[in-house]
Design a protein with these regions (language model features):
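Accessory nucleic acid-recognition modules appended to NTPase machines
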Residues: 205-379
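Domain-level recognition of nuclease-like catalytic cores that cleave nucleotide substrates
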Residues: 170, 416-439
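Short glycine-rich substrate-engagement loop in P-loop NTPases that contacts/grips substrate
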Residues: 54-85
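Interdomain motor-coupling "hinge/lid" segment immediately C-terminal to the ATP-binding subdomain
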Residues: 129-253
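N-terminal pre-Walker A segment at the start of P-loop NTPase domains
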Residues: 1-13
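Conserved lysine of the Walker
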Residues: 32
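Hydrophobic positions on the alpha1 helix immediately C-terminal to the Walker A/P-loop
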Residues: 35, 39
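Hydrophobic anchor at the beta1->P-loop junction of P-loop NTPases
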Residues: 24
Length: 439
């Protein structure tokens, strides 16, 4: 079974909660159900699980509930395990099929607080828009993402000692042990192909068969397309959203990687088109990276919501959509070819999984910074991502560091190199993005 950091997050909720239920959201196929089931079996004597898509009778019963008593009675009627106070986890899955159940959490935990409750579902960003209210103070939540790079390394049997070597090298800005550095670099190249979708990772780890891997990935891509058709508001929106989704690989291959709304459907109001882009983001399928007018803290103040790059939630799916030629090049370590979009997609999903908001900066006089992230203490970090050998060519980063009004102390280049620190620029191995959350 794949080791997921979300299990630690669930355990922390159980340890620290007072009366809150927990909502786990995230895109389809990122492993929510599996992790919550593992959590239930590990930390509780009993697990009562209702899936509102697999069990339409349970869905119908819950939809008819008007009170906490009605809801609990419906849960008990379809429970396949015992409801024992203090020893049972109640897991309601696919709650996007019954979003109003979330509004009843407050009354459920107040009336039947001797049980723990976890809700989960996909497309919650779109499916929960119409609910009456979300109970503030009675619902904790977090978002799950595909396996991050460290989780992928654990799936590939990388030792804790090797991971700690990377972490220590990052803390002390020193070079990683050469053997470990080579292993991590090779695994990062592999991660660009496999990505972090659990079904894809599991298939590759067990078989090392790229064809089996692509079957799993293509199945997920097809599922996302079906979800768009099923859950979009109308046929016109479904067609436009599917076109945006299918255009992501081609758009990321453009020099500026920015979406041009006119390429999707000419003549459509900008606000309508924005909603279609946001549908993919709300569903967890895509990761928008917004432009900022100034790379200064707080970045949100200068965000331009109508100018953004759009990445997929998983680099493996992007590589799958790009075709076998790209996979062959990566398998043959032909990283000299310009696959910057794949590298940037991997960096975007890693940063997002670790809680960073995603921004980039572009200015005619300075140029473009691939990513700009911020820390709570007011520190802004500009990041350049380099997939080729000329990683020390970064005029935009140099100009941004020299701009006194920005007040940026240090910049980072993520590249195919071991650690090098020169002046106010840190050249770090591209896989070391996994450590940024620890700074």
């Amino acid at each position: 079974m794949l080791r997921r950091k979300a299990l630690e997050r669930l355990a922390a909720w159980k340890r620290d909660k007072t009366t809150q239920a927990l909502l786990v959201d995230g895109a389809r196929q990122v492993g929510k159900t599996t992790v919550i089931e593992e959590f239930g079996h590990t930390y509780y004597e009993h697990l009562v699980e209702l899936n509102f898509i697999d069990n339409p009778e349970a869905l119908s019963a819950v939809q008819k509930a008007n009170t906490a008593d009605d809801l609990f009675m419906a849960i008990a009627a379809f429970a396949q395990d015992e409801l024992i106070p203090g020893k049972t986890l109640v897991f309601l899955d696919e709650v996007q099929a019954c979003p109003d159940v979330v509004t009843m959490v407050k009354f459920l935990v107040q009336r039947y607080g001797q049980y723990d409750y976890v809700f989960s579902g996909s497309l919650l960003g779109t499916g929960l828009r119409g609910i009456r209210s979300v109970p503030v103070g009675f619902l904790d939540s977090f978002t799950m993402y595909p396996l991050d790079f460290e989780e992928y390394c654990m799936a590939r049997s990388v030792s804790n000692q090797a991971l700690e070597e990377v972490a220590d090298a990052f803390r002390n800005r020193r070079q990683v042990n050469p053997a470990i550095h080579q292993r991590m670099t090779d695994l990062f190249h592999e991660y660009l192909i496999v990505g972090g979708m659990p079904a894809a990772v599991d298939a590759f780890v067990k078989t090392h068969n790229v064809q089996q891997l692509r079957l799993q990935q293509q199945s997920i891509v097809d599922q996302y397309r079906r979800d768009i058709s099923q859950y979009a508001d109308n046929l016109a929106d479904a067609r436009a959203i599917r076109r945006i989704f299918d255009l992501v690989p081609a758009e990321l291959n453009q020099q500026n990687k920015r979406f041009r709304i006119t390429q999707v459907s000419k003549g459509t109001r900008l606000s309508r088109e924005e909603d279609r882009f946001l549908w993919l983001a709300d569903a967890g399928v895509a990761l928008p990276v917004y432009n900022v007018d100034e790379p200064r803290y707080p970045l949100m103040l200068s965000m331009n919501s109508r100018l953004f790059k759009l990445f997929l939630n998983d680099v493996g799916l992007l590589t799958c959509m790009c075709g076998m030629d790209v996979i062959r090049d990566l398998l043959n370590d032909r990283t000299d070819i310009n696959y910057g979009a794949l590298y940037e997609n991997a960096i975007a999903q890693e940063l997002k999984a670790h809680g960073f908001n995603l921004f980039y900066y572009k200015n005619n006089s300075i140029g473009e910074l691939d990513f700009v992230i911020e820390y709570p203490h007011g520190y802004v970090r500009p990041i350049e991502v380099k997939s080729g050998k000329s990683y020390k060519r970064h005029s935009a980063l140099t100009k941004a560091l020299n701009a006194e009004n920005f007040g940026i102390r240090k910049g980072t280049v993520l590249a195919e190199t071991n650690t090098q620190c020169e002046g106010n620029i840190d050249y770090l191995p591209v896989y070391m993005v996994s450590q940024f959350r620890n700074e």
